[in-house]
């Protein structure tokens, strides 16, 4: 397996400056416990990505940063403890990373999680050839969708 990949990364944001580059030697991430490695097939561009690019999110991620919240891809590696996914599974990612323990999560309002994060904002996102994602955030793509 390749050890490096291409990724579109932000190198500077805010103060009227945005530096966005295609980097060709980014290390391929390794999935940890409960995570999978995805080969990204598609990643949408949405308002959250634009706000991140413009430095208008509450917390600016460390640079360089890979944005991209709307990810679809194929599982290419599973980390320890992952039993519900296999190499070759086609998936999409729910980008709302919730704790599952706070009052909002317990009532089903995971988008209001007290410790919530957004995939591609507080974590590396999908504007790359490969991305690591929590296995619990994946949804299976039906065969009827290409």
Segments the model singles out, each with a brief description of its role:
Residues 14-16, 59, 100, 111:
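Flexible, glycine-rich phosphate/dinucleotide-binding loops
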Residues 27-43, 56-105, 137-143:
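Glycine-rich beta-strand-centered segment in the early N-terminal region that forms part
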């Amino acid at each position: 397996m390749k050890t490096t990949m291409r990724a579109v990364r932000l190198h500077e944001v805010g103060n009227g400056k945005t530096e966005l580059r295609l980097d060709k030697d980014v290390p391929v991430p390794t999935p940890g416990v409960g995570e999978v490695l995805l080969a990204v097939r598609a990643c949408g561009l949405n308002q959250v990505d634009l706000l991140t690019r413009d430095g208008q999110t509450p917390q600016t991620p460390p640079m360089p940063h890979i944005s991209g919240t709307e990810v679809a891809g194929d599982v290419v590696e599973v980390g320890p403890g992952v039993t519900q996914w296999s190499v070759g599974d086609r998936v999409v990612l729910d980008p709302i990373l919730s704790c599952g323990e706070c009052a909002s999560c317990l009532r089903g309002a995971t988008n209001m999680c007290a410790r919530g994060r957004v995939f591609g904002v507080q974590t590396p996102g999908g504007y790359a050839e490969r991305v690591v994602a929590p296995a619990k955030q994946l949804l299976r793509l039906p065969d009827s969708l290409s």
